[in-house]
Amino acid sequence: MGAWASRGRAARVPAPEPESEPEEALDLSQLPPELLLVVLSHVPPRTLLGRCRQVCRGWRALVDGQALWLLILARDHSATGRALLHLARSCQSPARNARPCPLGRFCARRPIGRNPCGQGLRKWMVQHGGDGWVVEENRTTVPGAPSQTCFVTSFSWCRKKQVLDLEEEGLWPELLDSGRIEICVSDWWGARHDSGCMYRLLVQLLDANQTVLDKFSAVPDPIPQWNNNACLHVTHVFSNIKMGVRFVSFEHWGQDTQFWAGHYGARVTNSSVIVRVHLS
């Protein structure tokens, strides 16, 4: 018998596709400033301040200018957006050289405090009790914190304070005295699971001579020992701000209740002061 002959179809080799030319990246910096302004107005405020402002001098000038933020607010139909736009139009900031428009801070709800989570002890006036202040990792996640680190106290009262100059932060007297802003203060504090702790907070609104015009204090009950790494939040809103407020003094204390050498006291972090429009 003869061998079976197989008839296979010849495999088709696909023809090579023509090489496509690489697409050119879109360079937004080539846009006219008026058109680039419209494009940037669709970017979230925090991204504008944190990233876009760093791209180049041209972008920085647009982000620091008032026109971009007025364009953003004109499209914001929320109660906060409408109130902020009305405030911006009726209480315009004076011309400033090389100063970012403060509307960006309002839109992004950016705090005006410095070093809230323990990047060393910089920007704080400190008094060291016991073995003094140190910085450690958080034992419990603090929502919204820029970093998960905290300031830790010792077996005697440790004190830490910042005095914030509102005009240096870009706010001007007419705005501060308009009766249409409020100041929200916030602080997180907690304990180790194996040691109780105590905590105090004092926030004062000061005039140009640093005379106290208003204040808020919190002296919560101590956290007991064996507490599952408790973490608590303290907030207060100054909504009826008196004429003449120019500074905010933010001060807190902490210590442990076991009086152990080392750092077993109150753990404080994510301290913030936010100036925002008052919704009447």
From Swiss-Prot:
PROSITE patterns: FBA, FBOX. Transmembrane segments: none annotated. One of its GO terms (biological process) is glycoprotein catabolic process. InterPro entries: F-box-assoc_dom, F-box-like_dom_sf, F-box_dom, F-box_only, Galactose-bd-like_sf. It comes from the Eukaryota. Residues 1-26 are annotated as: Disordered. Residues 100-277 form the FBA domain. Keywords: Ubl conjugation pathway. One of its GO terms (molecular function) is ubiquitin protein ligase activity. It holds the Pfam family FBA. Residues 25-72 form the F-box domain. SMART domains: FBA, FBOX. SUPFAM superfamilies: F-box domain, Galactose-binding domain-like. One of its GO terms (cellular component) is SCF ubiquitin ligase complex. Part of a SCF (SKP1-cullin-F-box) protein ligase complex. Interacts with SKP1 and CUL1. Substrate-recognition component of the SCF (SKP1-CUL1-F-box protein)-type E3 ubiquitin ligase complex. Able to recognize and bind complex-type oligosaccharides. This is F-box only protein 27. The gene is FBXO27.
